Regions:
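The start of beta-strands in P-loop NTPase/AAA+ ATPase cores
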Residues: 162, 193-195
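PLP-dependent aminotransferase class I/II
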Residues: 61, 228-274
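N-terminal small-domain helix-loop-helix segment of the aminotransferase-like
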Residues: 2-94
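Residue-level marker for buried hydrophobic side chains located in beta-strands
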Residues: 168, 196-197
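Short glycine-rich anion-binding loops that position phosphate/pyrophosphate groups of nucleotides
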Residues: 33-35, 168-172, 237
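Walker B catalytic acidic pair
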Residues: 200
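Conserved core of the PLP fold type I
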Residues: 56-187, 203-224, 230
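A general structural signal for well-ordered alpha-helical segments in protein cores
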Residues: 40, 44, 65-66, 182, ...
Length: 274
């Protein structure tokens, strides 16, 4: 599956056809948000089976989706969230939008103060800025050949913040954060009452022999039980299936209910048939 050349020109590809429209078909896309090899055969077979009846009506999320999320997390990462804590969003960036534009402004009566590491995923930054948030970007230290969080600046930014946009493994550097770094994040979040959204969409890409990924929810049970930690995952990167738009948002209690209300307000219901 990794040695077959697939041409994506003319398929309405955001990666290739948008580039061609701007720069011509000789341009080479260096984006890595999706890839040029096919998804695994099991995924293709499942989609083919879903197509066979020939009816593509409105669909709904049931507990089999939530059970699938819990099962994957348990098998791969040793974490078994409660089924009732699993919520569906098409894309993680839409969950960020719901938080920044609806949920947190409703809670505080103002635009939230948001902390993120820099560099960060561009569409998420755009959503935060368009929501009128105060964005605090903490540049990562790359001076010694590895990615390091400047702890003093990070702690200062967290002091009166409302939301931390965390990413593990980090996008775009690929850094998997250590136990000590996760300790720092959870301690600061608990100390200052900061909500944490952990975008773990790349969690299933791990290189053998490197620092292993661990969900923040496992690392800090106290932060998870506080109801201020949102764990986000998706098969989109792992299986090169971003166009199917399916993400799992796992969060405890009232915050999950508020995200569901915000999702309805955004007109997000009846997910993609696939």
């Amino acid at each position: 599956m990794f040695d077959k050349t697939i041409t994506r020109w003319g398929t309405h590809s955001a990666k290739w056809d948008l580039l061609a429209a701007d720069l011509g078909q000789d341009a080479l896309s260096l984006s890595v948000a999706d890839m040029e090899f096919a998804t695994c055969p099991a995924v293709s077979r499942a989609i083919t089976r879903a197509c066979e009846p020939g009816i593509f009506g409105y669909t709904e999320v049931f507990d089999d989706f939530r059970e699938a999320v819990r099962g994957w997390q348990a098998r791969r990462h040793g974490w078994s969230p409660a089924v009732g804590d699993v919520h569906f969003f098409p894309r993680i960036v839409q969950c960020v939008s719901a938080l920044c534009a609806i949920v947190l402004p409703g809670q505080f009566g103002r635009a939230p103060r948001v902390v993120t590491l820099d560099p960060a995923y561009g569409p998420i930054i755009e959503v935060v800025e368009r929501a009128g948030c105060e964005l605090r970007r903490i540049p990562l230290d790359l001076s010694e050949g590895r990615v390091v969080i400047p702890e003093r600046h990070f702690a200062e930014a967290m002091r009166d913040a409302d939301l931390l946009l965390w990413c593990n493994p980090h996008n775009p550097t690929g850094r998997v954060w250590t136990s000590e770094e996760l300790d720092m994040v959870s301690t600061l979040a608990l100390t200052y009452g900061v909500t944490v959204l952990s975008d773990d969409i790349h969690a299933d890409f791990q290189r053998p022999g490197r620092n292993g990924y661990r969900p923040l929810a496992i690392h800090s049970q106290q932060l998870w039980e506080s109801g201020r930690l949102i764990q986000c995952s998706s098969p989109g990167k792992t299986f090169n299936s971003a166009g199917l738009e399916a993400s799992a948002i796992v969060v405890r209690g009232v915050l999950g209910e508020r995200l569901e209300e915000a999702k309805r307000l955004m007109g997000l219901h009846n997910p993609n048939f696939f």
